[in-house]
Regions:
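Topogenic membrane-insertion module of multi-pass membrane proteins
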Residues: 1-2, 7-10, 14-86
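Hydrophobic alpha-helical transmembrane segments
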Residues: 15-23, 44-58, 74-80, 100-107, ...
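Multi-pass membrane catalytic core of lipid/isoprenoid biosynthesis enzymes
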Residues: 33-36, 42-52, 65, 70, ...
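Alpha-helical transmembrane spans of integral membrane proteins, capturing the lipid-embedded, hydrophobic core
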Residues: 47-48, 52, 69-77, 109, ...
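Helix-coil boundary and interhelical linker segments in multi-pass alpha-helical membrane proteins
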Residues: 52-70, 113-129, 164-183, 236-241
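C-terminal ends of transmembrane helices
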Residues: 80-93, 136-150, 196-202
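Intramembrane alpha-helical segments
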Residues: 100-172
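C-terminal transmembrane helix-loop-helix hairpin of multi-pass membrane proteins
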Residues: 189-241
């Protein structure tokens, strides 16, 4: 099949445009699809799940499970991903208003920090050190501060996998149990597999690799995220029922 020049450049744009990613809705306006896509909902679902793991590793209260879930949704799902779009050297989402992204990020962080501070001052002081560390990684990793020194797999595993589990336990009982530590290790390992697979996936797409090659990585990403999210639902039902 011989492609015209316009077809060729269209395909090149689609290959580099994040709107063509598997986690972006295929329906709706461009702004709607961008707004949903930039949240990386499957990955956000993972980090929220890890926070729930932490809560379920100790004696828990349903209201606090909801609170820690919302905290991480606003902090990571919205704020971190918006800051990542700002800090990225490339513009995979196209030219988005920096002002709007900063406003959304600040509002989201204000909500998440308000939730965290409420429970930290109430009876969960362990949220203070966890929040400080998470806050550091949120800016250092996503905005690639300090010449990108902290934009690496280790920072991702700590902030995305391990600390959310600790935070989930801390908001419930202000303690870190043996079960919490075990679950944090599992979450850290899952996060490592996710980020390694994600990087390989992006490289293959950027190199215009054969569809079957990067589709395998895409399938792995779907399996990892769905396994964690579905597993969390089953874990919750087992503990709740």
């Amino acid at each position: 099949i011989i492609l015209s020049i316009s077809d060729y450049f269209y395909l090149k744009i689609m290959e580099s445009d994040r709107l063509s990613e598997w986690f972006v809705p295929k329906f709706g306006s461009r702004n709607f699809r961008l707004s949903i896509g930039i949240l990386f909902l499957p990955y956000t679902g993972m980090v929220v799940s890890f926070a729930i793991w932490g809560s379920l590793s100790v004696e828990y209260d349903l209201n606090r499970i909801v609170a820690i879930g919302l905290l991480y949704f606003f902090a990571i799902g919205i704020a971190a991903h918006c800051l990542d779009a700002l800090g990225s050297k490339k513009k995979p989402w196209g030219h988005i208003s920096h002002r709007k992204i900063w406003i959304v990020s600040i509002i989201s962080l204000a909500i998440s920090f308000s939730i965290g501070l409420h429970y930290a001052f109430l009876d969960s002081w362990l949220l203070f050190p966890i929040g400080i560390i998470e806050g550091f990684f949120l800016f250092a990793y996503n905005l690639e501060l300090f010449k990108g020194k902290f934009h690496n797999d280790t920072s991702f595993v700590i902030s995305w996998g391990i600390l959310p589990v600790f935070a989930g336990a801390a908001i419930q009982s202000n303690t870190i149990s043996i079960e919490t530590i075990i679950l944090s290790a599992i979450a850290g390992f899952a996060s490592y597999i996710l980020i390694i697979t994600s990087r390989k996936y992006k490289i293959l797409k950027q190199q215009n690799a054969n569809y079957e090659m990067y589709y395998k990585k895409e399938t792995m990403l779907k399996i990892i995220t769905s396994t964690v999210i579905i597993g969390t639902v089953l874990f919750f039902l087992a503990r709740y029922l």
